């Protein structure tokens, strides 16, 4: 009988202790957190937590930071599509400013390029004809570089006179027959460019020069005879 009473009291004490006890799971951070002082930073507190709990807290922090930004991510494609025309306009303005700066920096080269535009148009329309036209002169320049030096200086000093001279060069057949006579003829042309604004008159003079043997033998005496020039005028 005494044993039964003792067992009954034991069961009653166990039930009372179970009803009033607080269970702490293994993965809970409450025991450790209760021991930490309140003035520690959250970073130090997170380092002192249970290692099992740390990944869950990191995931919770990431989710907390991403969820408020989710409407922005949903609206971002439409905002980018609305900003594309503005981006293209800004890019075009930047290109235009760069071209203006390039033109202002190289104004002389830009003006010379506009003066050489007829030859560039010929090269763009018919590249074969342009190459055939330039081939005899390039061969002559390669064969006689020193004799073509005055023409390079003329191009640097007076581009308009140089262009007039270059426009008349393809009509001269003397370059294919006699390069030496052609070079002599070209050396005489700069002296007539300033007095003959008419290209047709200069072309007629070019056609008459090969028949004048005095120009090929003695250019000084030839300069003193304005017979051909006066007859043409």
Curated annotation (Swiss-Prot):
InterPro entries: Zein, Zein-alpha. Residues 1-21 form the signal peptide. Keywords: Repeat, Seed storage protein, Signal, Storage protein. One of its GO terms (molecular function) is nutrient reservoir activity. Pfam families: Zein. The alpha zeins of 19 kDa and 22 kDa account for 70% of the total zein fraction. They are encoded by a large multigene family. Belongs to the zein family. Zeins are major seed storage proteins. This is Zein-alpha PMS2. The gene is ZMPMS2.
